[in-house]
Design a protein with these regions (language model features):
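Intrinsic-disorder-associated, low-complexity terminal segments enriched in Asp/Asn/His/Tyr and depleted
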Residues: 1-7, 26
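ATP-binding N-terminal substructure of ATP-dependent carboxylate-amine bond-forming enzymes
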Residues: 25-128, 132-133, 137
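Polybasic, lysine-rich low-complexity intrinsically disordered segments
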Residues: 10, 18-19, 26
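Active-site nucleotide/adenylate-binding loops and adjacent lid/helix of ATP-dependent enzymes
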Residues: 131-218
């Protein structure tokens, strides 16, 4: 809500695609201060980088992470050890902050839904996070919004994948992706032969065509 002190007038001038901010009347060094607390689920490297900015803006932060020595621990105002997938841990943590965000998508969405209903501002919103957490839902989202993506097929079990190969419905090579719990390359495998299939997780997944590309971008 108000990230600037009320007694500071801000005048923005746009000239040649540059923004000039002029602070008038009672200029102070804490003009970025806020009385609200930002909660961050996850205290890894990304959380630590986020805290670089919150400290510059004098934003009070609380971090929840299962690792008592998480990278973000030293840079936040309050640190709590807790399971990000545990409903009660996430809910109790969220009740102590004004705005809640994530550093990693592996968090308890049901707790976030309850917090949002009770007035806590959650970003990204829980319904968006549900899509982010599941690669099958992601692909369906791309397809329904006409966003170009590699062709794919969903499978509930690894046995179904094997059966599709036997029937000639799938051919090597292809990309196997775990529907959930995949991150930083984990849960993604380029499969070249039947032998490599045996090392894959047996749960829900999607099989994606192997495409050539020049550059990979993460947004």
């Amino acid at each position: 809500d108000n990230i600037y002190n009320k007694d500071i007038q801000i005048v923005l001038f746009f000239f040649k695609q540059k923004s000039y901010v002029y602070f008038c009347k009672n200029f102070t060094m804490d003009f970025f201060s806020t009385s609200k607390t930002l909660g961050i689920l996850g205290g890894g490297q990304l959380g630590k980088m986020l805290l670089y900015t919150t400290r510059k803006w004098d934003i009070k932060t609380s971090v929840l992470d299962p690792n008592e020595n998480a990278p973000a621990k030293l840079a936040c105002d309050n640190f709590t050890v807790g399971d990000l997938t545990d409903f009660q841990a996430v809910y109790d943590f969220g009740k102590k902050v004004d705005v809640l965000t994530i550093e990693i998508e592996k968090v308890n969405v049901k707790a976030l839904e309850k917090l949002e209903l009770e007035g806590v501002k959650v970003y990204p919103q829980p319904h968006v996070l549900k899509t982010i957490q599941n690669k099958c839902l992601q692909k369906k989202f791309f397809k329904s919004h006409n966003i170009p993506t590699a062709s794919f097929e969903e499978f509930e079990t690894l046995d179904q994948v094997k059966e599709a190969i036997i029937k000639g419905e799938l051919s090597f090579p292809f990309v196997w992706k775990s529907a959930e719990m995949g991150y930083d390359g984990y849960g993604v495998t380029i499969v070249q032969s039947n032998k490599e299939i045996e090392s894959l997780d047996i749960g829900p997944c999607l099989i994606e065509e192997l495409v050539t590309f020049e550059k990979e971008l993460s947004v």
